[in-house]
UniProtKB/Swiss-Prot annotation:
It catalyses: tRNA(His) + L-histidine + ATP = L-histidyl-tRNA(His) + AMP + diphosphate + H(+). GO terms for cellular component: cytoplasm. The gene is hisS. GO terms for biological process: histidyl-tRNA aminoacylation. InterPro entries: aa-tRNA-synth_II, aa-tRNA-synth_II/BPL/LPL, Anticodon-bd, Anticodon-bd_dom_sf, His-tRNA-ligase, HisRS-like_core, HisRS/HisZ, HisRS_anticodon. It comes from Clostridioides difficile (strain 630). It is found in: Cytoplasm. It comes from the Bacteria. This is Histidine--tRNA ligase. Keywords: Aminoacyl-tRNA synthetase, ATP-binding, Cytoplasm, Ligase, Nucleotide-binding, Protein biosynthesis. Coiled coil: none annotated. PROSITE patterns: AA_TRNA_LIGASE_II. GO terms for molecular function: ATP binding; catalytic activity, acting on a protein; histidine-tRNA ligase activity; transferase activity.
Length: 420
């Protein structure tokens, strides 16, 4: 057990870590283009934060959160998603006092107790965007455009952007009464989960994953057909803006998302992987959340989250390879004790000039040193022997062309700066 990671967690080894850095750097690059700044929040928060934001009746709160009491008898939860913590930080640090909108991004681990499977771990990692202080559909369109551009730039172009409107408290009041009446008539054929949701949060029934139950409610009324004038206008404008940016989309009335804080726009982005579809991003608008968590009234928000593990699996499934950018510029092969000692100064000089360099540290033979230099894909190998030291020289080998030249040690660093 001591040498095995806990179920639902995974080590990111050097053979994989560069892929993570690549997509993370690309995400940061795209966020900067859109004017988003990084927000870093703790990996644990007060449990009540998630109960009030994500929702008491959600699967996340009821079944999936890692919650515990700390030594001060405080209820603490490892964050299962990124939005609640960012909104809490927005309120606590009074970012609403700055010029609005506040445009934030985050890169964070999250934790949910789920059955581990491909692309879904108990500790997983998310990129996320939150834009607070704008209730306009243009903000919704920008968020979606940012996500699409990010996916395009990492190589995912065959995307389906699915959008819906889940309404607001005004249109939901009438709709929920209609929905409750419909679901009550189906109570005998609903699954246990849906019957529980029918009482507490009827719209969540639309999100049911039980195939039999879904078939039984295939004629369920959708909120998108019962929007108030304001929500309908908002949704129509969003579509207009997406069309203007040539972002292809479909309207999917079944998208309600699994969190209680969504209002108006909800969306998912799906990648058409080889032989399967994979949801790589989901988000929506949460206009009442800031006030609900104790912040000022009237501050709207919208955001999305995307799982890094699932993204990397999707890239792999689409045959998109990420090249490892890390390689060693120079490897020093030493022959003799004095040459080995003198190589340390050369190694230091190279590194201080921002030339990546390495040498043997386990007393390999000369042949094994050359073999190792080739294995790590070094660009040049420098050979230093005791005899060469007397003449202040070394042999420089180009590992790609196998060309060898004799160079002066005193000018070697400057020569390499020209060659690299």
């Amino acid at each position: 057990m001591l040498t095995k990671a806990p179920r639902g967690t995974k080590d990111i080894t050097p053979k994989e870590a560069y892929k993570w850095r690549y997509v993370e750097n690309k995400f940061r690059e795209i966020c900067a283009l859109y004017g988003y700044e990084e927000m870093v929040t703790p990996i644990f928060e007060h449990t009540e934060l998630f109960k009030r934001s994500v929702g008491d009746t959600t699967d996340i709160v009821q079944k999936e959160m890692y919650s515990f009491k700390d030594k001060g008898d405080r209820e603490i939860t490892l964050k299962p998603e990124g939005t609640a913590g960012v909104v809490r930080a927005f309120i606590e640090n009074k970012l609403y006092a700055d010029t609005q909108p506040t445009k934030l991004f985050y890169v964070t681990p999250c934790f949910r107790y789920e059955r581990p499977q491909a692309g879904r771990q108990r500790q997983f990692h998310q990129f996320g965007i939150e834009a607070l202080g704008s209730d306009t559909p243009s903000m919704d369109a920008e968020i979606i455009a940012l996500a699409v551009q990010f996916f395009n730039e990492v190589g995912l172009n065959d995307l389906v952007v699915s959008i819906n409107s889940v309404g607001c408290p005004v249109c939901r009041k009438e709709y929920n009464a209609l929905l409750k009446e419909y679901l009550d008539s189906k109570a005998d054929i609903l699954c246990d989960t849906c019957n529980e949701r029918r009482e507490k949060n009827p719209m969540r029934v639309i999100d049911c994953k039980n195939p039999t139950c879904k078939e039984n409610i295939k004629d369920i009324p959708f909120i998108a057909d019962h929007l108030c004038d304001d929500c309908k206008s908002h949704f129509d404008k969003l579509q207009e803006y997406l069309k203007e940016m040539n972002i292809n989309f479909v309207i999917d009335k079944t998208i309600v998302r699994g969190l209680d804080y969504y209002r108006k726009t909800a969306f998912e982005i799906i990648s058409n992987d080889i032989g399967a579809q994979s949801t790589v991003c989901g988000g929506g608008r949460y206009d009442g959340l800031v006030e609900q968590l104790g912040g000022p009234k009237g501050i709207s928000g919208i955001g999305f989250g995307l799982g890094i593990e699932r993204l990397l699996l999707t890239l792999e499934g689409n045959g998109i390879e990420i090249e490892n950018p890390q390689s060693t510029d120079i490897f020093i092969v030493t022959i003799g004790e004095e040459a080995n000692t003198r190589s340390f100064k050369l190694l230091k000089d190279l590194r201080q000039n921002h030339i990546s360099a390495d040498k043997d540290h386990i007393e390999r033979s000369v042949k094994a040193q050359f073999k190792y230099s080739d294995k790590i894909n070094s660009k040049f190998t420098i050979v230093i022997g005791d005899d060469e030291l007397k003449n202040d020289t070394a042999t420089l080998k180009n590992m790609k062309t196998s060309e060898q030249t004799t160079v002066k040690l005193s000018t070697l660093v400057e020569e390499l700066k020209q060659k690299l």
